[in-house]
Amino acid sequence: MVGNNSCGSRSIQYGKMVDHVLELQGFLASALPFKFGKLTSNELKRTLQRSDQVSRIIQTVNQLAITHRDEITKRFPKIMRRVAGYNLDQLNLEDGFNLAGLLVGSQGTLAVNVEAKVSLVSRPKHAVLGVCHFNSFSDSMHASDPIVSLKPHAVELSDKLLVDLARDDPAYRNKLHFVRGNPEALLIVEFAGESETPLLRKLDDLEILM
């Protein structure tokens, strides 16, 4: 998950793996062990004065981040599920320099990670689902942006091919009671939170939107 910068159906709420990795430990190509985490400005200054290999890597990457800061900010796309390429934009964070963010998603090309310290989130007590039916795939795509404005925890697409395959499979056939007719596409929308009443209102808002 760290190597791929993975994210799942609830990334709309919780983000990607890189948003939760605090520290990484592992080995460089030289077999030298490392531990990368957030460095305060004073810690970074001390690191920049050392001459060991790990410190030299931090020095080089820090200088690249400073030199190309404007270009990185300008060119890196601001999209929710951007998991391709190296996370150079993670080096421009204002709250501290952390090289761990660059390793996330690098698929082992920069180092071998053996341990990760990650942040955790509480699981919501309540969740409700709304299943939106569409007569065309394009209609479902046009509806996704307004649906996201309702701040759901998840929005998942199932097209007609997937629904038909499920109907042909005895293991899933009896679990499709929520599918009405023969839609070309479904958007399955989840709302979650600590109280059920606001979530039911969200479902009402979703129904009005549809």
Go through each PLM region and give its residues.
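Terminal amphipathic helices with adjacent charged low-complexity linkers/tails
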Residues: 36-39, 43-44, 116-123, 141, ...
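Short glycine-/small-residue-rich flexible loop motifs, especially phosphate/cofactor-binding loops
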Residues: 101, 144, 207
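Signal/transit-peptide handling
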Residues: 89, 132-155
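FAD-binding subdomain of flavoenzyme oxidoreductases
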Residues: 1-138
